[in-house]
């Protein structure tokens, strides 16, 4: 997404992979980056030692009903592995799984609004338990019925549109990052000293 659409994130390292769930991080599976090719995501993060890490994954993992328990178990393990690898000083942001359009949920029942909301409640608890910051994307991305706003959706109804969708996501993250004077990622946020 971010790399493919050339969205400026102030020099942030983007580890964007298609269809990756927390199990791929825990199991150190090789994944494909559209920018760097095949790599082990945990190795990339270990080498970079970021001060802040934003995690958004799970939508593709939850497409089938019944996948939530396994996903959440691996997510907790992933947060433990990331904390061990990146240290206590790294601020880890756990982003909620975004809503999808109703037609996408009809095709992929594991993405029904009530299932995603339930998983997000568990992610919030996991984040608190593991000393991470939880970011609730729903307040920006969901419409009144709990679906991804049509104007923010790509044609598949699951992913964000190149302009509006990614723009809304980036704006939300910038405005909800913990303030730090050395955090160039907050450029453009209401806290930035630009």
Protein language model regions, located:
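Short intrinsically disordered, low-complexity coil segments enriched in acidic
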Residues: 1-8, 75-76, 90-92, 116, ...
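A generic secondary-structure signal
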Residues: 43-44, 77, 81-85, 172
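Catalytic His-Asp segment of secreted/periplasmic serine-dependent ester chemistry enzymes
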Residues: 99-194
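Short amphipathic alpha-helical segments and helix-helix/interface helices
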Residues: 42, 79, 120-124
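Extracellular/periplasmic catalytic domains that process cell-envelope and extracellular macromolecules
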Residues: 46-49, 85-87, 128-129
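Active-site segments of SGNH/GDSL-like serine hydrolases
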Residues: 54-62, 81-118, 138-139
